[in-house]
């Protein structure tokens, strides 16, 4: 398609010292792969949520032990669970509410729920959460200058 044969591409990867980190994605051996970005590349129908989104928005100083994503109800997420990704499901009507993008610590852009949606999600599941993460996120949100209380109430 681009005028490069498969054998030429394979030879380039070998000569450049690249390693395959995902289908169609290669990294130099010195580079650290961006796990969240790789998950997003392989799974276009996910949105990072809960503690993962809180961390990406700067509402938590703790990165979650495992990435947390939300998918539409009915989506077969068994491959995500095998990759040690925590999966939440929502009805289709709620899936797109509050979707936005955020930058990973490696500078890549991934889909996440906005701060207000994250607050709603953690309020619904606060008994499941670490209390310190919950309190830190709530305090950080309500102290932030870019909070949108009207949007929060709408959600």
Residue ranges and their predicted role:
Residues 8, 13, 21, 25-154:
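Nucleic-acid-binding surface
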